[in-house]
């Protein structure tokens, strides 16, 4: 008898949760970590994204979880930390950047710019993490730090699903 071994896809993790499975399962895991579903904001962003409030990297954050509207499979999650001070947001950016560099020492790194601030992307076999700052005059805060995780395998499946509609 021949035994075959199947390679199992490793998925990018957000808050220790693999970016895989259905939005319902992912939501249960976030809630178990103390996050709260923000129903009002979720309705505003529409199908394909659910929002939560919770703690990320020791800070109050708004969490966005993106999923394929047809399959309900999660492929991306993002935490946004808000600040009213430019100095505060830059300090937090530097702190998170250092932590990501430590956690992902073998990642390919790409630097860029967003809203006049440095941005950085960490690329691994499992996916990518984008770190960037945005400015806003339309919200109750002036600056937001985005920590944006994307799972490579499920992001590709999501894109293929959309392309099948064409």
Positions of predicted regions on the chain:
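Bacterial Sec-dependent N-terminal signal peptides
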Residues: 1-8
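Non-cytosolic coordination micro-motifs
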Residues: 8-47, 78-166
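Mid-chain, structured segments of secreted extracytoplasmic proteins
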Residues: 49-94
């Amino acid at each position: 008898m021949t035994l075959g071994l199947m390679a199992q896809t490793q998925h990018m993790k957000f808050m220790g949760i693999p970016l895989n499975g259905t939005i319902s399962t992912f939501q249960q895991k976030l809630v178990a970590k103390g996050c709260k579903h923000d129903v009002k904001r979720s309705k505003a962003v529409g199908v394909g994204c659910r929002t939560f409030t919770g703690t990320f990297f020791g800070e109050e954050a708004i969490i966005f979880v993106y999923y394929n509207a047809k399959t309900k499979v999660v492929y991306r999650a993002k935490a946004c930390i808000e600040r009213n001070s430019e100095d505060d947001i830059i300090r937090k950016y530097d702190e998170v950047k250092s932590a990501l560099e430590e956690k992902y020492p073998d990642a390919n790194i790409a630097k860029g710019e967003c809203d006049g601030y440095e941005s950085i992307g960490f690329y691994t076999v499992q996916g990518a993490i984008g770190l960037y700052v945005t400015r806003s005059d339309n919200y109750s805060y002036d600056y937001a730090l985005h920590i944006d995780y994307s799972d490579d395998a499920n992001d590709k499946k999501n894109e293929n699903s959309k392309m099948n509609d064409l």
